[in-house]
Amino acid sequence: MSQLETRTEPMVVNFGPHHPSMHGVLRLVVTLDGEDVVDCEPVIGYLHRGMEKIAENRTNVMFVPYVSRMDYAAGMFYEAIVVNAPERLAKISVPKRASYIRVLMLELNRIANHLLWLGPFLADVGAQTPFFYIFREREMIYDLWEAATGQRLINNNYFRIGGVACDLPSGWLEKCTDFCKWFGPKIDEYEKLITNNPIFRRRIEGLGAISREEAINWSLSGPMLRASGVSWDLRKVDHYECYDDFDWSISTATEGDCFARYRVRIEEMRQSLKILLQACEMIPGGPTENLEASRMLEGKGSKFAGFDYQYVAKKVAPTFKIPDGELYTRLESGKGEIGVFIQGNNDVTPWRFKIRAADLNNLQILPHILKGAKVADIMAILGSIDVIMGSVDR
């Protein structure tokens, strides 16, 4: 890309990789003309751990605990995609109840992801208070995860080929419903604090604007794409899991700037709450304690002992072989499209396991939208993209 003409002697400044606003070990080599950004070169790779090669030397069950170390704000999404790929290649069906449990975990993770984006983003532009609020809400999600999976943040190790590791514990659905009813007003609280705050709006409106055509041409996904007016969400497009059972809408904006990306993520949290409440109510078999009681009452012939009421289709043996063939599968995470290209050769480990991270693709547009911006705007624009270097570098 061509550099802008400079009025003064250009100065090269390094931001990161240890700067607190870099959202991980990202280094930006920025060329400045006074206060204006002339050029920017992101330097990545500081957190590369060879995840794809690790996947090619592990069975699926062995690899699932690794993946939440990639995007440590959205481990459930990577667990889901890592089991979805061999499932689809081997044509393994997933029980309806297991699919609902997966959706519950994914939507909780979407809210947790957006909360962890919201706090640091606002801290970057000078609003300190919400940073403490978001951890109060995330604690509730941690508690729900801990009850279901045994772990709070990462290494939940909950998704399995054909379903999930275990059924939801007694009382979990009621706690999840309580959380949803409690969290709805908290989003209103954030909006009251932030959305119409004139200082906040003047600070970020018009910053880092991306047109609809640019968003499509740069292969953006997630809130970055939808904030530019493209109504594209893989939950609606690919019809994976059981998202078609629920009534919800895609959140979009048209301005394509930092403020639009903020609004899209806030609205996505509301839509996730709608999905969670419907899933808690409609899950096949209902709460675990009711399901077990019905099975005991009706005996062996009970319909509740059928396939769709199980939490896993059939526990996959450690010797499960990934069949010959290749396949690309994708899903909508909090950051955008994450995907896995898997190539099997009838062995317990895949021959090729390529991971597509949403934030790596979204980060590529950063030099383009930083040109002409001020030094003070770098952190606001980078923060609005939502990058986690664990998944960018893998």
UniProtKB/Swiss-Prot annotation:
Positions of transmembrane segments: none
Assembly and binders: NDH-1 can be composed of about 15 different subunits; different subcomplexes with different compositions have been identified which probably have different functions.
Membrane topology classification: Peripheral membrane protein
UniProt GO cellular component terms: plasma membrane-derived thylakoid membrane
Main location: membrane
Role summary: NDH-1 shuttles electrons from an unknown electron donor, via FMN and iron-sulfur (Fe-S) centers, to quinones in the respiratory and/or the photosynthetic chain. The immediate electron acceptor for the enzyme in this species is believed to be plastoquinone. Couples the redox reaction to proton translocation, and thus conserves the redox energy in a proton gradient. Cyanobacterial NDH-1 also plays a role in inorganic carbon-concentration.
Alphabetized InterPro entries for the sequence: NADH_Q_OxRdtase_suD, NADH_UbQ_OxRdtase_49kDa_CS, NDH1_su_D/H, NiFe-Hase_large
Entry's localization field: Cellular thylakoid membrane
Assigned EC number: 7.1.1.-
Name of this protein: NAD(P)H-quinone oxidoreductase subunit H
